[in-house]
UniProtKB/Swiss-Prot annotation:
Entry remark concerning the domains of this protein: Death domain is responsible for interaction with RANBP9. It also mediates interaction with ARHGDIA and RIPK2. The extracellular domain is responsible for interaction with NTRK1.
Glycan attachment points: N61, N71
The protein's name in its UniProt record: Tumor necrosis factor receptor superfamily member 16
Domain Death per the UniProt entry, residue ranges: 354-419
Length: 425
């Protein structure tokens, strides 16, 4: 009996030990479930990856995931319960700096010249540094413009939100200062007329036969011809007056100038003589022809003994064409926007990113309903500029003024630098 009881007790202990082992293994399996959720059958619910949302949560069945739609929905977490979330829309004065993709939401930022107020979340216009103050921190994202009063030695003569205080101009040794530098205006310098450099003065009472210590002042309107060879100052024996001899280059300059002048005068006289002789022959030929005979063309060539042929009519037409072309190049098409090169207009379209073109349209006189109609076009900026460019008042000056009013000085500088680079001299 005792042996049977002992055997039963051992069996009970073995069963209890097996139950404990199974319980521990079952609890450990549940602890390794990353989601902490289980199906009705005890299976760990799986999580949806980044870019996927839960279409059907687990319960009777396992979790069902679906991919998020680009530019429509996104999911930036790994979850067994979160569905795809709708993308954020950039509205009003906001522009998109990063698009909405499957795993990341869109990132919006305020348009150029605006920043996001942290308290209201709205886009506010950047503060302008007044005259006498300069930029310390630029206006961007959630940071408004930070200005400072220009310290000594710097100035700012323009109110904007992009330029810091500039260092004052320091006049050179050959200049004199007309106006001091102030926090709101730069210093103004003027060239001093050229003078001879004074030499050291010998002590009084000395018997030195050196020349005068101060060279005479040369009037500013007279040009001084620099010498490449140093002036040599000698003293004639028995005389206190110095003898100044110039270098060889100074002696040759008048000779070269005389030869050049003689060549120019001779060439002008030769051309004048040939023209006078040609006119005389033309008059004699015209008198010998009948009255009803057609006069000779103005383009008749004039031959000289040297073999040089001059076509007076061609020269006249060429000069007239050159003057006309120069006048048109200087005058342009009345500075119309449509006269800009295609590449320059495309550059303006690229710079008008985000919703900046809406503000430009308002400055150009378009109503809100007309501005909204441009959004239906494939490229609203190009449609706006094409519509405005067709008007008679669509001048480049009007466009530059509108760009300055919306604080787009970068586009103004681009247009002005291009116009300067291509303008005729």
């Amino acid at each position: 009996m005792r042996r049977a009881g002992a055997a039963c007790s051992a069996m009970d202990r073995l069963r209890l030990l097996l139950l404990l082992i199974l319980g521990v293994s079952s609890g450990g399996a549940k602890e390794t479930c990353s989601t902490g959720l289980y199906t009705h059958s005890g299976e760990c619910c799986k999580a949806c990856n980044l870019g996927e949302g839960v279409a059907q949560p687990c319960g009777a069945n396992q979790t069902v995931c679906e991919p998020c739609l680009d530019n429509v929905t996104f999911s930036d977490v790994v979850s067994a319960t979160e569905p795809c979330k709708p993308c954020t829309e950039c509205l009003g004065l906001q522009s998109m700096s990063a698009p909405c993709v499957e795993a990341d939401d869109a990132v919006c930022r305020c348009a150029y010249g605006y920043y996001q107020d942290e308290e209201t979340g709205h886009c506010e216009a950047c503060s302008v540094c007044e005259v006498g103050s300069g930029l310390v921190f630029s206006c961007q994202d959630k940071q408004n413009t930070v200005c400072e009063e220009c310290p000594e030695g710097t100035y700012s003569d323009e109110a904007n939100h992009v330029d810091p205080c500039l260092p004052c101009t320091v006049c050179e040794d050959t200049e004199r200062q007309l106006r001091e530098c102030t926090p709101w205006a730069d210093a103004e310098c003027e060239e001093i007329p050229g003078r001879w450099i004074p030499r050291s003065t010998p002590p009084e009472g000395s018997d030195s036969t050196a020349p005068s210590t101060q060279e005479p002042e040369v009037p500013p309107e007279q040009d001084l011809v620099p010498s490449t060879v140093a002036d040599m100052v000698t003293t004639v024996m028995g005389s206190s007056q110095p003898v100044v001899t110039r270098g060889t280059t100074d002696n040759l300059i008048p000779v070269y100038c005389s030869i050049l002048a003689a060549v120019v005068v001779g060439l002008v006289a030769y051309i004048a003589f040939k023209r006078w002789n040609s006119c005389k022959q033309n008059k004699q030929g015209a008198n010998s022809r009948p009255v009803n005979q057609t006069p000779p063309p103005e383009g008749e060539k004039l031959h000289s003994d040297s073999g040089i042929s001059v076509d007076s009519q061609s020269l006249h037409d060429q000069q007239t064409h050159t003057q006309t072309a120069s006048g048109q190049a200087l005058k342009g098409d009345g500075n119309l926007y449509s006269s800009l090169p295609l590449t320059k207009r495309e550059e303006v379209e690229k710079l008008l990113n985000g919703d900046t073109w809406r503000h430009l349209a308002g400055e150009l006189g378009y109503q809100p309903e007309h501005i909204d109609s441009f959004t239906h076009e494939a490229c609203p900026v190009r449609a706006l500029l094409a519509s405005w460019g067709a008007q008679d008042s669509a001048t480049l000056d009007a466009l530059l003024a509108a760009l300055r009013r919306i604080q787009r000085a970068d586009i103004v500088e681009s247009l002005c630098s291009e116009s300067t680079a291509t303008s005729p001299v």
